[in-house]
């Protein structure tokens, strides 16, 4: 993804700010002027924020961003927060911080259309990587996906999945070629969490709350159009996702 070449200009207080920051501030001010945070419904405001390129400012224009440094997202949050606006991603932290960036890098144009409802909290996302027998070695997964025509049939189990019980979609990795070395035989998919065969079971804590879940897949059919990147590129998708966990 390309970013603009930045220069510095003088800000309102006489201090120097970058041209990119000045641009971001201008876009934020126009967003707030056109969509009063005090009267605009939260989802409508967040959709307008996405359309303005202020969802993930480092994403390309037209995909929720402006093509500027990700550090400028702080400027967006501060100014929208000061105006009483909603904080995009707060209700959807896994989707916003990890799944969205992975789909932006590896997804198809059709898959990237899911970023807008993800950001507006219309659709919650979860990450389906960890398995009971794999421990911290994500690549040692046993969940299988087998191609059947233009669909993949998935069987297996994931665990410690945050917010899966509320999710519309999940970013799933599964083994598609058991003959290859473990890091190479993995493929990533976007799975409909309400598809037949998906069984989400909350893991109750002593407090009665259930932030984490087990998710079982029994002959779940995923269209090949929901495969993320090429077959066998699931580990690359995983690395992108987990690197964003470090900064989300």
Model-derived segments and spans:
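Amphipathic, small/basic residue-rich leader segments at the start of a protein or domain
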Residues: 1-94, 104, 113-117
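Short Gly/Pro-enriched turn/cap motifs at secondary-structure boundaries
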Residues: 93, 133-136, 160-163, 178-180, ...
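A short, Trp-centered hydrophobic/proline-enriched beta-strand micro-motif
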Residues: 121-129, 173
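Short Ser/Thr-interspersed hydrophobic loop/turn segments at strand-loop and sheet-helix junctions
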Residues: 53, 76-81, 174, 191-196, ...
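A short core secondary-structure module
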Residues: 155-201
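A structural signal for short hydrophobic beta-strand segments in well-ordered beta-sheet cores
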Residues: 143-146
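Glycine-rich beta->alpha junctions and the first turn(s) of the following alpha-helix
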Residues: 198-248
